[in-house]
Amino acid sequence: MYHCSLERMSDKIHTFSKFGDAGHGGITRYALSAEDKMARDEWVKRMTAIGATIEMDDLANMYATIPGSDPNAKRIVMGSHCDSVKNGGNYDGILGVMSAMEVLETVVAENIPHKHPLTAMIFTNEEGSE
């Protein structure tokens, strides 16, 4: 049986909660702001470290993909947004991003066989900006 890493997930929660933390509760991480870019840069660093291929579309949605055993199989996509409203919840959106990251990290770390390419995704501007 395979298990996600509590240590890896705790590290992600600790690290990503810094991006947009003004020190008074909640997170302010507007889409495409400096704080959003810091979170995205960290995501790219971690996904690149496991060998994922990184792509960005014309709307700045980002994709990290690890190949499956069948190059013709449709990819499985999971993820969320990392932007927030002003003083938004610490885990709103970003928890889905971190969970998708953990799936890919676990598949790679545990060498789990899989047919379909697996993609972690960050959606851009889900919350809208001020």
Protein language model regions, located:
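Structural signal for hydrophobic packing residues in well-ordered secondary-structure cores
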Residues: 13, 17-20, 50-51, 104-111
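An acidic- and aromatic-residue-enriched active-site/binding cleft used to recognize and process polar
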Residues: 59-60, 81-83, 123-126
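Domain-scale detector for complete catalytic domains at protein termini or as standalone homologs
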Residues: 50, 55, 69, 108-115, ...
